[in-house]
Curated annotation (Swiss-Prot):
Lineage: Eukaryota, Metazoa, Ecdysozoa, Arthropoda, Chelicerata
Naturally occurring in which organism (per UniProt): Cyriopagopus hainanus
Keyword Secreted: yes
GO cellular component: extracellular region
Protein's job: Ion channel inhibitor.
Record's keyword terms, sorted: Disulfide bond, Ion channel impairing toxin, Knottin, Secreted, Signal, Toxin
Protein's name in the database: U3-theraphotoxin-Hhn1i
Length: 87
């Protein structure tokens, strides 16, 4: 009887240890994609978009005029490509 109790205790302790190890490795794996994405999409000062006098594609055109090749959508007030049905 004692041997069965000891084996049950060891089995339970092993399962708890396995759970703790799996949880720790999973939490590290969750942080890895966040770190990878933040390093890929980190904005460097050299690559920041310069302020323009005109608004580009899908930019708000209430205060700024659209850049050449785009027209201001009357409904959404965004700069969009000119199309025959928008003329």
């Amino acid at each position: 009887m004692v041997n069965m109790e000891a084996s049950m205790f060891l089995t339970f302790a092993g399962l708890v240890l396995l759970f703790v190890v799996c949880y720790a490795s999973e939490s590290e794996e969750k942080e890895f994609p966040k770190e990878m994405l933040s390093s890929i999409f980190a904005v460097d000062n050299d690559f920041k978009q310069e302020e323009r006098d005109c608004a580009g594609y899908m930019r708000e055109c209430k205060e700024k005029l659209c850049c050449s090749g785009y027209v201001c959508s009357s409904g959404w007030k965004w700069c969009v490509l000119p199309a025959p049905w928008r003329r």
